[in-house]
């Protein structure tokens, strides 16, 4: 399961700055997700092969209204749900009464908590550690979030007990796994043994649990016509046509302002974790409501996580032809950014169209985890460049030399060349569409990463032979004598 890290602390200690710096490492900020209070944000980040979910909580002032009330309103849920709590304090302001109250609460919860002394610029680190030692949460980790100082040490401590992502490939592995001349091959991994993990996600009351029951053929998940019936993510293994699957039924993510019970607030993290844990995401929408903004938020997170995607419009039965045509137009207009995903019009209640989901799941999973040899990917690149060359940069043209596979689920294609940092986004989209069309990729995002040409001798110090050293000395002596003669003539 993807670990969850919560940032807590008083107002203005740098939590949001830290949140932006950490999530910007993958440009995967997911701000203002529904189901969050006004001052909380959820984001996804990755550090040294470890993905994690980050929560930016509201500031806790510890004023006269009491610590418990503030914690319940802003940060208690994040602390309870988190695997690790980073307790940010202001090294400049020093140890305050509010810090003491927050520290006492964390000790009572028996959570893995670390004190992070932020704004350490021009402050003695040893003094900062001593300042916050009375809280009893270990030595403070000195950082300067605004400038990135100490961030690596903080993440190393926070994530050291969590393994690297399962689909992380070691450098160079992509070239050796597939022999030249072999067209493609399926990447072995946990999914081959345990079955394809499918996360069923969507807003509350769109029919996710009904769909799970229909796919299983039995009532395994309690279903009521009440949003938020499913309180936690439920993992259900099963087999169909000798294929293994595991369905993950997630609690519905409620719209902000409609959450009243603590247990439903937890469902936001559970949904995000389920997306990261899945191989394929089936995104369920209510056809009668069409595409709403909250659907786009959830789709955005699934895309940032790089998961294969299948879209199911539920409650299609009972709609008039005119209503169906309107919904299809809305889908084309608002879901253009996921045009690679199969869309199914289903009725989970009556089973119409549900069986077709399995083929899309299989196709999406295969596209997400298939590996191609370097020669194949490079040939596609050469054909694409031949048909439509990269633009000129000044008087020089961008050169793209070769490509190889850098990862799977989603497929990551690494392209090497010169001036690659100047490749425009429009050309990146052209390459993505070309690879998707030629490789017949369906249902999965595709990512392209560029690497510039590197000097293989950079950093190598050339050791001179004795003969070269003597020659260099003679030449330097000759130049000195020549300079002296020129000065004497003047």
UniProtKB/Swiss-Prot annotation:
Residues 370-454 form the KH-like domain. SUPFAM superfamilies: P-loop containing nucleoside triphosphate hydrolases. Residues 470-490 have a biased composition (Basic residues). Residues 3-166, 196-369 form the EngA-type G domain. The keyword DNA damage does not apply. GTP 1 binds at residues 9-16, 56-60, 118-121. Keywords: GTP-binding, Nucleotide-binding, Repeat, Ribosome biogenesis. It holds the Pfam family MMR_HSR1. GTP 2 binds at residues 202-209, 249-253, 314-317. One of its GO terms (biological process) is ribosome biogenesis. Residues 452-490 are annotated as: Disordered. GTPase that plays an essential role in the late steps of ribosome biogenesis. Belongs to the TRAFAC class TrmE-Era-EngA-EngB-Septin-like GTPase superfamily. EngA (Der) GTPase family. Associates with the 50S ribosomal subunit. This is GTPase Der.
């Amino acid at each position: 399961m993807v670990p969850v890290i919560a940032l807590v602390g008083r107002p203005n200690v740098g939590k949001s700055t830290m949140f932006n710096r950490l999530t910007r490492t993958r440009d995967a900020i997911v701000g203002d997700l529904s189901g969050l209070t006004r001052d909380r944000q959820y984001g996804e980040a990755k550090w040294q092969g470890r993905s994690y979910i980050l929560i930016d909580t509201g500031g806790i002032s510890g004023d006269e209204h009491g610590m418990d009330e503030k914690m319940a309103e802003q940060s208690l849920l994040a602390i309870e749900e988190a695997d690790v709590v980073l307790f940010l304090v202001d090294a400049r302001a020093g140890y305050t009464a509010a810090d003491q109250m927050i520290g006492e609460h964390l000790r009572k919860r028996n959570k893995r908590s670390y004190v992070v002394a932020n704004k350490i610029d021009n402050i003695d680190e040893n003094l900062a550690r001593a300042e916050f030692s009375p809280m009893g949460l270990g030595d403070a980790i000195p950082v300067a979030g605004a400038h990135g100082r100490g961030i690596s040490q903080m993440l190393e401590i926070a994530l050291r007990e969590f393994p690297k992502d399962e689909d992380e490939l070691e450098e160079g592995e992509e070239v050796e796994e597939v022999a030249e001349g072999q067209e493609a091959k399926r990447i072995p991994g946990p999914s081959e043994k345990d079955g394809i993990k499918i996360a069923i996600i969507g807003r509350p009351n769109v029919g996710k649990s009904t769909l799970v029951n229909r796919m299983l053929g039995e009532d395994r998940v309690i279903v009521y016509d009440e949003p938020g019936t499913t309180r936690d993510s439920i993992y259900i293994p099963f087999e169909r046509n000798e294929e293994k699957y595991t369905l993950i039924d997630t609690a519905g993510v409620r719209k902000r302002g409609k959450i009243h019970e603590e247990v439903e607030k937890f469902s936001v993290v559970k949904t995000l974790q389920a997306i990261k844990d899945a191989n394929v995401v089936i995104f369920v929408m209510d056809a009668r409501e069409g595409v709403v903004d909250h659907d786009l938020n959830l789709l955005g997170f699934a895309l940032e996580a790089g998961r294969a995607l299948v879209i199911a419009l539920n409650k299609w039965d009972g709609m008039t032809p005119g209503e169906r045509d309107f919904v299809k137009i809305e889908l084309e207009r608002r879901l253009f950014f996921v045009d690679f995903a199969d869309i199914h019009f289903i009725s989970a209640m009556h089973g119409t169209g549900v069986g077709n989901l399995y083929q899309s799941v299989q196709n999406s999973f295969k596209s997400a985890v298939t590996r191609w040899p370097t020669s194949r990917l490079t040939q596609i690149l050469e054909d694409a460049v031949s048909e439509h060359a990269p633009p000129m940069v000044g008087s020089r043209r961008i050169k793209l030399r070769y490509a190889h596979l850098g990862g799977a689920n989603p497929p990551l294609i690494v392209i090497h060349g010169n001036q690659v940092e100047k490749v425009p986004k429009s050309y990146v989209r052209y390459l993505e569409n070309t690879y998707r069309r030629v490789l017949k990729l369906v249902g999965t995002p595709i990512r392209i990463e560029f690497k510039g040409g590197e000097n293989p001798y950079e950093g190598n110090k050339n050791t001179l032979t004795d003969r070269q050293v003597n020659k260099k000395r003679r030449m330097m002596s000759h130049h000195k004598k020549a300079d002296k003669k020129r000065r004497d003539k003047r």
